[in-house]
């Protein structure tokens, strides 16, 4: 049986941590930023953890992580 492939999109966007959690970047921060307030842009900085309701699909996309 051949190996399962990791989805390239998940590989580029997600980082698996040592405790089993998955880290992701915030969306809506790439373009059309002039109409967004400074507060909104500040709150979109940094990374957050993937929610537990999405972890099953993330694990399916990254079988060896």
Swiss-Prot record:
User: What SUPFAM superfamilies does the database record attribute to this sequence?
Assistant: L35p-like
Q: Signal sequence span per UniProt?
A: none
- What's the protein name? Large ribosomal subunit protein bL35
Q: Which UniProt keywords apply?
A: Ribonucleoprotein, Ribosomal protein
A GO-annotated cellular component: cytosolic large ribosomal subunit
> According to its UniProt record, which protein family does this protein belong to?
Belongs to the bacterial ribosomal protein bL35 family.
Q: Which gene encodes it?
A: rpmI
GO biological process terms, alphabetically, are: translation
What Pfam family is a match for this entry?
A: Ribosomal_L35p
- Which GO molecular function, any one, fits this protein according to its record? structural constituent of ribosome
Annotated transmembrane regions? none
């Amino acid at each position: 049986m051949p190996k399962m492939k990791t989805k390239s999109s998940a590989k580029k966007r997600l980082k698996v941590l040592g405790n089993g959690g998955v880290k992701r970047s915030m969306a809506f921060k790439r373009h059309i930023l002039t109409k967004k307030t400074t507060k909104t842009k500040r709150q979109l900085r940094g990374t957050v953890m993937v929610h537990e309701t999405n972890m099953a699909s993330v694990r399916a996309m990254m079988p060896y992580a």
